[in-house]
């Protein structure tokens, strides 16, 4: 099994088509799951062009193996568009919470070392009536992750009406867990932990999960860079 996360500029018509009619496992050999989303800048104003960027696609996918992903790049129209962008191939490590599409993953498949790079993906199916409250608590956390010195790349993605995701690359597992558990200095460091307390008080979502991965290899470029994943230490 292999996971991958993709970022690419595909144009609005292609993005809308993928959001409305994503590739299905039965139609793509070796594809197990695929979550297509529109890119979003973390911490962007609620009403702004940066909040939902249809021309920038973010895709989380699960494959039988690397050959299936390579075949998708060559043979599927969306795959060929994604191949022009950037992606990272991932080994699944841990899961917190549950979203039906990824509930088959074990809570722990392997452990990361404190000093090694990790990738974190959150995926939520939001309760629409809780959306204003989710935004109020979530935007400060978005800014915290976006500006964290230990995160080399951090962004969000959405698929209307209710799917919301974040994707972040961390220089170390230690840096990521320090942010999650509020061990960073100052009031900013408490934002994520505070939002989790509010989540426990009254859930924002129908479903929510956090997935942790080990980055295996990085391909292509995004925003002029091809070195978002730190080297193994």
Question: Where is each model-derived feature located?
Answer:
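Compact nucleic-acid interaction/catalytic patches
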Residues: 186-192
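A basic- and aromatic-enriched beta-loop-alpha substructure that forms the phosphate/nucleotide-
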Residues: 61, 69-78
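Short S/T/G/P-rich N-terminal loop/turn motif that feeds into the first structured element of a domain
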Residues: 1-57, 66-72, 83-159, 175-186, ...
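Acidic/histidine-enriched, beta-strand-rich ligand/metal-binding domains
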Residues: 158-160, 192-195, 199
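Alpha-helical membrane segments in multi-pass integral membrane proteins
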Residues: 157-158, 165-168
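Generic transmembrane alpha-helix motif of multi-pass integral membrane proteins
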Residues: 59-61, 166
């Amino acid at each position: 099994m292999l996971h991958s996360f993709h970022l690419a500029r595909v144009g609005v018509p292609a993005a809308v088509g993928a959001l409305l009619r994503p590739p299905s496992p039965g139609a793509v050999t070796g594809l197990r799951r695929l979550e297509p989303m529109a890119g979003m800048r973390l911490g962007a104003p609620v009403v702004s062009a940066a909040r939902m960027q249809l021309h920038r696609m973010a895709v989380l996918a699960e494959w039988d193996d690397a050959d299936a992903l390579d075949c998708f790049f060559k043979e599927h129209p969306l795959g060929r568009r994604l191949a022009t962008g950037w992606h990272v191939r991932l080994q699944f490590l841990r899961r917190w919470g549950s979203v039906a599409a990824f509930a088959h993953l074990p809570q722990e498949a392997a452990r990361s070392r404190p000093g090694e790079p990790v990738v974190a993906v959150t995926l939520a199916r939001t309760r629409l009536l809780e959306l204003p409250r989710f935004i109020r608590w979530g935007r400060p956390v978005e800014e915290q992750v976006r500006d964290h010195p230990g995160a080399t790349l951090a962004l969000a993605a959405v698929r209307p009406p209710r799917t919301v995701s974040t994707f972040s690359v961390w220089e170390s597992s230690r840096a990521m867990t320090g942010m999650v558990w509020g061990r960073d200095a100052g009031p900013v460091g408490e934002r994520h932990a505070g939002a989790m307390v509010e989540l426990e008080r009254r859930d924002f979502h129908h479903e929510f999960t956090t997935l942790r991965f080990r980055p295996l290899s990085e391909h292509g470029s995004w925003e002029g860079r091809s070195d978002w994943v730190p080297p193994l230490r």
